[in-house]
């Protein structure tokens, strides 16, 4: 909703809810949305300490997502999952956000190998938004 109407209250609620979800179960999808919202908030606020906190928490969250998903990829059952391509997409975005471009590209290529046009479009749109808010 925030991206549609720029109402910061929607962004604050998203951060609160995604943050709770992330802290409860460390699901990569929830965590990626939490980190993204934190970066959006950092762009909106003038107060220096809060801006630093939001960006730090986003980076910390993405590093934990990377750790969790790298462990998952090494699990013998990984290829049986139905969301492998989205895990690759998430890893690509997380690595991109912490300036590990080679790893980001590696996982982007893995995502692109078997993705449909709408999935690629979704990935590219998310990547574009991420680049805009972290630069």
Where are the model-predicted features located?
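Residue at a conserved register position within TPR or TPR-like alpha-solenoid repeats
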Residues: 1-2, 38, 45, 95, ...
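Short coil/turn linker motifs that delimit alpha-helical repeat modules in TPR/alpha-solenoid proteins
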Residues: 3, 7-10, 23, 79-80
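Structural motif corresponding to the intra-repeat A-B loop/turn of tetratricopeptide repeats
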Residues: 4-8, 41, 98
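Helix-turn-helix repeat elements of alpha-solenoid scaffolds
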Residues: 5-16, 53-71
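TPR/TPR-like (Sel1-like) alpha-helical repeat modules
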Residues: 19-27, 35-40, 53-64, 101-119
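Boundary/linker segments of alpha-helical solenoid repeat arrays
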Residues: 22, 27-30, 73-81, 113-129
């Amino acid at each position: 909703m925030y991206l549609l109407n720029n109402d910061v209250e929607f962004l604050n609620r998203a951060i609160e809810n995604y943050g709770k979800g992330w802290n409860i179960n460390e699901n990569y999808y929830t965590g990626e949305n939490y980190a993204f919202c934190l970066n959006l908030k950092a762009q909106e606020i003038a107060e220096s300490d809060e801006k630093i906190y939001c960006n730090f928490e986003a980076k910390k969250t993405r590093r934990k997502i990377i750790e969790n998903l790298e462990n998952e990829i090494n699990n013998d059952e990984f290829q049986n999952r139905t969301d492998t391509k989205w895990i690759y997409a998430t890893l690509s975005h997380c690595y991109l956000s912490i300036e590990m471009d080679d790893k980001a590209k590696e996982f982007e290529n893995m995502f692109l190998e078997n993705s449909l046009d709408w999935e690629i479009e979704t990935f590219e749109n998310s990547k574009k938004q991420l680049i805009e808010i972290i630069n």
